[in-house]
UniProtKB/Swiss-Prot annotation:
One of its GO terms (biological process) is DNA replication. Belongs to the phage GPA family. It is an enzyme of class 3 (hydrolase). Its EC number is 3.1.-.-. It comes from the Bacteria. The keyword Nuclease applies. GO terms for molecular function: endonuclease activity. This is Probable replication endonuclease from prophage-like region 2. Keywords: DNA replication, Endonuclease, Hydrolase, Nuclease. The keyword Nuclease applies.
Length: 804
């Protein structure tokens, strides 16, 4: 108690002295001089000391980097198992023990063998399979997990080996044995850069083969054409070892009964292609994609449970290819000799390459067939033909098909083509005729099947149906039994249910762009037909399957050329009397008028009608050789116009020659895109650094001001303008930026705005006010893979055709 009182008294005394010191600053105690405790107050930092400290830090970091690099070099080149016998022996013992342990585990658990085999596969096979195995393992059902490995994964691996053996033949392996061509054995695992390098090596090998053949065959200076053909045969034989058909092979190969002389002029272009690395790249890349897709089909990664019709990898590649094509079209334009320009994107969208135009033309053609059938009193039958079970890789439940014989998608298409050719030959021999259209589309595993809309005489319907059934089920007949429906299904079209056009409309739209099928659900895949259209398009492009084919009617290319001619005549003649003839021959003018009106039924009847041989058609497509040779020295064939056997000469519909050029770049936008280095870049170029406007003013400064002219003076000036002045005027007009159209803005409620913000957030976007305002004004946001997000009809949609 006494100690606490003394302590309290001492604290009060000390506190009072401190308060007095705080009141008078001269009474504060002085700090002891000790440079070791606080040297900063007595040694202020200078610029030199800071620089020395920075150098010291840099030296320490450099020393640490050198020590780390020295340790890495020591570990890699001096202290490793290849140079240290003791460490090498220890590493070998560790690997042997690990292998023994794994072998013991696999003997007691066969599932581990399957997982190990899956892990040994390439990444495009092992990664998706391991994800599925991991998912089944996470379910916690041991028996189902083991059954999945034994009944699904193991058969898939066995099928994969059979597919690889069928892809790589003995001759292909022989070619891969040459120096530098070992990559042919792993072609499906390569990317584009690797395939490009491999194609260069293959082209070099073909060049060496040609040099060796020339050295053996060309013994004298007077080389005969037959000796050149023998040298070509040697190079062609090497190309055929790679499962590639040489160019012009059918025309140049040896035949026992040749009716025409050998076209020796085709040998140089054929050799130029077989010695070109770009040509080999296209062939090898196509082969790589097909082989890779067939391997994915073998392991059940192409079906309605995984990816219908085609693999996701092929769909993504098709999207990227479409995106690059759109960028190319938007960056180029077409120009003629007069300086007139056309936007290349507008030209492509206005052509038959536009899916909407292609669909409309096909629907118009089918409608014309329907009208002709009504006029003739013919009946319409809808047929469905499917390949045998040995062509189907996957069952309907997504499991491997035990009857599959490693047949490819292309082989299934060839089977249907051969079957149809045999049936058509037998039908003509029996005196039966029909006309219509067929549509080729895939099953969920990619196997081809056909839908045919055929028109025929009512008295021939039973005979044609029975004959077609005979050819459709003649192979593997025992697997069908009494029910032939899975292979062949006929359906007589009932006018009460719908017209023939309505029957085929869904299949046409489904295989082009899925227009109008957003609410239609596929019975086979369970997905929307509009969403499946992208997969179907990628499937047809990858496997080179012709989706649509009309038969028994005149060609549609002449129809397109006639419509083009009618449009050109209307522009040239100006205001002419409605119905005035364009062609002198009234029969040809009637065909032209029918095509211009868009009536396929009238066009077909004016051409001669259905079931008429091609040699009796009035109007046909005319072709000619290109003026300029290709990169391989040959002149390709292009469309010239139309011609008719009842009239002399040809009519040209492509008189103006257009050249593809890159669009002019806006200098201000290009400089803004270059950033801070733009001024240096402009001043360091060797060419003229003036903007295009200044260059144009220097070269064409004597051009009059068009703005000050009235309408009559402007017409006279444009009429008397020379070619050089016209080009300069076109260049000036090209620099004028078009005025932006006033965009609209959609009005939505607050609830719809909140819903739009939530949907954007769910898709991975910020959902900010700027993004919502952009969508409401008709804009779009890129979402990856060439697709864009846009807001239309109070719905958030994703498409790559949002501009149309």
């Amino acid at each position: 108690m006494a100690v606490s009182k003394i302590t309290l008294h001492y604290a009060q005394t000390t506190g009072g002295s401190n308060e007095a010191a705080a009141a008078f600053p001269w009474n504060t105690p002085k700090k002891a001089v000790n440079p070791y405790l606080d040297p900063a107050e007595f040694a202020p930092e200078s610029a030199l000391s800071n620089l020395i400290a920075l150098y010291a830090v840099d030296n320490e970091q450099e020393q640490l980097r050198r020590e780390t690099l020295s340790d890495e070099v020591w570990e890699r080149y001096f202290f490793n198992e290849s140079r240290d016998p003791v460490q090498r022996e220890m590493e070998q013992d560790r690997l042997i023990n690990h292998a023994k342990t794994a072998r013991e585990q696999q003997r007691f658990n066969p599932d581990l063998v399957i997982i190990a085999n899956v892990g040994a596969q390439p990444a495009h096979i092992s990664k998706p399979l391991l994800e599925r195995i991991k998912y089944f393992h996470s379910l916690g059902r041991a028996k189902a997990y083991s059954r999945y490995l034994q009944k699904t994964i193991r058969p898939c691996l066995e099928r994969l080996e059979r597919v690889r053996d069928s892809q790589v033949s003995a001759s292909f392996r022989f070619m891969a044995s040459h120096d530098g061509l070992e990559g042919l054995l792993v072609l499906p695992e390569m990317n584009q850069d690797q395939v490009k390098r491999l194609s260069t090596l293959v082209a070099a090998h073909m060049s060496m083969c040609l040099d060796a053949a020339c050295g053996d065959l060309f013994v004298s200076d007077d080389v005969k054409p037959e000796e050149i053909r023998q040298a070509w045969e040697r190079v062609a034989a090497e190309a055929m070892r790679l499962e590639v058909i040489p160019p012009a092979f059918e025309q140049l190969r040896r035949k026992k009964r040749r009716r025409k002389p050998v076209p020796y002029e085709l040998i140089p272009p054929s050799l130029a292609r077989m010695l070109c690395a770009d040509w080999w790249y296209r062939k090898l890349w196509q082969m790589r994609c097909e082989w890779r897709e067939e391997q994915l089909r073998a392991v059940c990664l192409v079906n309605k449970k995984a990816s219908p019709y085609v693999s996701y990898e092929a769909v993504i590649h098709k999207r990227e290819q479409r995106r690059k094509s759109l960028e190319f079209f938007r960056s180029h334009e077409l120009i003629n000799e007069d300086g007139d320009t056309l936007d290349m994107e507008d030209v492509v969208n206005a052509s038959n390459s536009n899916p909407a135009h292609r669909r409309n033309e096909m629907m118009a053609c089918v409608k014309g067939l329907e009208l002709i059938a009504e006029m003739r009193g013919d009946c319409a039958v809808f047929y469905t033909i499917t390949c045998p079970s040995r062509f189907h890789a996957t069952l309907n439940n997504g499991r491997p098909n035990p009857k599959w014989t490693s047949a490819t998608v292309r082989q299934s298409s060839d089977y249907l083509v051969d079957t149809f050719a045999a049936f058509r030959k037998a039908m003509h021999k029996a005196g039966l005729r029909w006309y219509g259209v067929r549509v080729a589309e895939p099953h969920h595993d990619g196997t081809v099947h056909w839908h045919l809309l055929c028109f025929m005489r009512k008295k021939d319907r039973r005979s044609i149906t029975a004959l077609l059934r005979k050819f459709a089920i003649r192979e593997d007949r025992e697997e069908l039994g009494a029910n032939t429906g899975p292979r062949f299904k006929p359906e007589l079209i009932n006018p009460r249910k719908g017209t023939p056009t309505s029957y085929i409309a869904k299949y046409i739209s489904k295989n082009i762009d899925g227009r109008g099928l957003a609410k239609e659900i596929s019975k086979e895949t369970g997905r929307s037909l509009r969403d499946s259209a992208e997969h179907v398009s990628a499937w047809a492009s990858l496997h080179r399957v012709q989706q649509f084919r009309f038969f028994g009617i005149p060609g549609r290319q002449a129809y397109r050329e006639l419509r083009l001619l009618a449009g050109q005549a209307a522009r040239v003649q100006g205001e002419r009397k409605a119905g005035a003839p364009v062609l002198d021959n009234p029969r040809l003018d009637a065909v032209l008028a029918a095509a211009d009106a868009g009536c396929f039924a009238t066009y077909i009847m004016k051409q001669g009608g259905v079931l008429v041989p091609r040699k009796h058609h009035l109007v046909r497509t005319a072709y000619e050789l290109n003026d300029e040779p290709s990169a391989y020295g040959d002149h390709g064939i292009r469309i010239y116009g139309i011609w008719s056997p009842i009239a002399e000469g040809k009519i040209c519909t492509h008189a103006v020659k257009w050249k593809k050029v890159r669009k002019a770049v806006d200098v201000q936008e290009a400089a803004a895109d270059q950033g801070a280095c733009a001024p240096w870049t402009r001043t360091r170029t060797r060419g003229n650094n003036c903007p295009p406007v200044e260059n144009l003013n220097k070269s064409g400064g004597d051009l009059p001001d068009i703005k000050t002219m009235n309408e009559k003076e402007l017409q006279d000036y444009l009429h008397n303008m020379g070619q050089k002045e016209r080009r300069e005027l076109t260049a000036r007009l090209r620099l004028v930026k078009p005025k932006r159209k006033t965009v609209y803005k959609q009005n939505i409620s607050e609830q719809q705005r909140l819903q739009l913000e939530a949907e954007l957030t769910a898709r991975g976007f910020e959902g900010s006010a700027s993004e919502i305002d952009l969508l409401l004004r008709g804009g779009s946001i890129p979402s990856g893979a060439g697709l864009r997000i846009f807001y239309r009809n109070h719905r958030l949609q994703e498409d790559d055709k949002w501009r149309q």
